[in-house]
Amino acid sequence: ATEGFTAPADGVIARSAEATVILDLDGDRDERTGWVLFFFHVATEGRIAEGVEVKKGDLLGFPSCEGGRSTGTHIHVARRYNGEWIPAAGPLAFVLDGWVAEYSGIAYEGTLTKGSKVVPACRGCARAENQIIYTLPE
């Protein structure tokens, strides 16, 4: 992939191995405490090293098909708080740059919504309307 993905917040890389990057937001380097962001299907080449302190917008790596079965190059992002996975949708919805995750009740069948734009999840597709690429403001 030519488009890398960047840190959505300041933190420190608690783990970087085997298609995974863990961004620790409280900076204690312990992914079992506080908020952490989990990125999966991260390419080995260009992946940020463990222990690096990052600022919002710093390059973390590149989407890939590494780390298991995949129908195409992509990235997963999830979050944990004190070691517990926090659902993307619901009362504590995951919001990234105004995009709000919504769950349909079926795995991989949710949407991202920002204002009037709704982007449905789509298994195995590469339609332009299902791609969100964020550019940091200058």
Where do the PLM segments sit?
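Zn2+-dependent peptidoglycan hydrolase active-site motif and core
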Residues: 1-2, 6-50, 69-79
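Acidic, glycine-rich catalytic/binding loops that coordinate metals and/or anionic ligands
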Residues: 49-55, 73, 78-138
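Short alpha-helical segments in extracytoplasmic peptidoglycan/chitin-binding modules
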Residues: 39, 54, 60
